[in-house]
Amino acid sequence: MVAIFLIAGLAQAHEGEQAPMKRRQQGILTGMPFMANLAPRTFVDDLDRKIYLAKAPIRIVSLAPSITEVLYAIGSSEELVGVTQYCDYPPEARLKPKVGYTHPNLESIMALQPDLVLAPREFLRADFLGKLEQLKIPAFILDAKTIEDVLSHIQTLGRMLGRSASADGLAAQMRQRITEIKTRTATLPHPRLLYVLNSEPLITVGPGSFIHQLIVLAGGTNIARRARSAYPRLNMEEVLKEDPELIVFPVGLVEGIPESEQQVWQRWTTLSAVKRGRFFRISSDLVNRPGPRIVEGLEIFARIIHPEAFEDKIKP
């Protein structure tokens, strides 16, 4: 738990030297009874840590592209004062000060005087989180494993940042689109699909990953559906046995499978996907980032798997 005290009644003479710390501390309470009249709000993150906010934060650092996309989508871009070097959507996010990614720069974060740091669990180091706690900088950790987690995070951030109306509206729109896509594909066959997350070694997605859930929602059968991990390794014997009818490669400037590695799959001539030329590409940003555009990724998966259900076809 990050316990930060809101100090009241500071003498006017100390206002200057206390200003940076006060900006971080403003709105963060301990929930003590004598402060109950401020009606603090409690938020529990995906590490089961609690933070208490009396008002919406006004200086936020985002440590993930997906989180940055959520903040822009719900109208909190003005409060966003720091991002990672991979926060590139929407384009104006590139103009925000950078604080690192897998190894965030603590000094850069401190210089921005944030009153909230939003971070993904994936790359978060315990020592880094401990340093934030020592500095009394509140951090809220997000770890989306399902589409519902993504929607829940959007609504939680909306409540936290005073953007409930826009966040709830966004989540409702996303749920409606998901329902529409499921309805289109519900009665259709479920072709076998391999999603190549990494080539060497061959890594795909399994139960426990939201990309697996996207494949299922789109009407496909993930050949790694029996895997015991969210991102299992496969050998070619397993792939040949499952015989995928579709092979999908993520592509992008940062994450993705290079064209040369995609072409290597042509050698496996007994695979149904190779025989029929059913190789497809999908933007890694749409499916690897658990943010608002995940529904766009779902629709592309659905168009790949069931082109007959859509007027606009996606060509291999």
Predicted feature residues:
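N-terminal hydrophobic or amphipathic helices and topogenic motifs
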Residues: 11-59
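Short helix-initiation/N-cap motifs at beta->coil->alpha
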Residues: 44-48, 97-107, 227-236
